[in-house]
Amino acid sequence: MSKVKTIVLRTAGTNCDQETKFAFERCGAVVEVVHINRLLNKEKVLSDYHILAIPGGFSYGDDIASGKILANELRLRLGEDLRRFIDDGKLMIGICNGFQILAKAGVLPGALNREPAGRGAALLQIESAKGQPLAHDRAPFSQEVTLTTNDSARFEDRWVHLKPAPQSPCVWTKGITQPIFLPVAHGEGKFIPKDNAVLERLKKNNQIVFRYTTRIYPKINRLKSGWPEGEVSNATSVPDSQGLGMAPSTFKDFREGVVEA
C-alpha cells in the first residue's frame, strides 16, 4: 500500500514547516516541504499530493494583514489547482497562520462544501473549436470569514482548553470526544464571519469543530482580556469534511517520539 504524500507549503516568513513535517512523518506520511514559488513555476504540482498542509509563522511578514499575501497567491495564481485538489477529495489543513491564509483565500469554510451540479461538474469546461478552455461553471473562491486582531489588542501566547464538537463532519477530528489542551500564539486570531447567516450555517452544519472552554482550569483559559480571540461563538477551528483550519498551534504539542535532552 502506497504511503500518503503530504506537501507542507512554505514561503518567506513561514517558521513552523519543520515541526509540521515531523508530525506528519510520525503519522506515517511521506512529506515534502515546498516553497510556494516551486508551485507557481510548475516545478512541483499540487495534484501529486494527497494532503496540503499550511503551517504557522508570519508569511510575508504578515504585511497588509495576517496571511493575506499568500492567500492572494493561492486564490489568484493557484486557484484552478486548488479546485481540482478539492474536487478529487483530497485533504488540507491550515494551522495558525495557515488558517488565516485558507480563510482569506476563501477556501475555508465555504469552498469545500459548495457542491457543483453533478460529480466533477466544477471542472467542466466550455471548449473552443481549438480545444482551449474558455470558462468554468464555478465562481472563484469567495471569502466568508476572517481572522483579525484579538480583542486583547496583543499577541496571545498561552495554553487553552478546546471543547470538540463530536458530530462534526471533519475527517481530521474523528474520534476526538474530550477537551484537548493546546497553545495559542498569534496577534490576529479573532474569528469573524461575514454575516450572521454564515455563522448560523456553520453552527447548523457542525462546522465549528472546537470552541474555547472555561470548564477546565478557568483561570488558565480566561484572562482579563477575555477569550484570546474574542466572543464570536468562541470559535477556534472551522472545518469542512476535507479541510480544517486551526487557530491554536497543534504542531507545538506533538510529543510522540520526541527525545528529551
Task: Name each model-derived stretch.
Residues 109-110, 199:
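Residues in and immediately flanking transmembrane alpha helices
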Residues 159, 164-261:
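C-terminal and late-domain segments of enzyme folds
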Residues 1-109, 115-131, 135-137, 141-142, ...:
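N-terminal beta1-alpha1 cap of cysteine-dependent amidohydrolase-like domains
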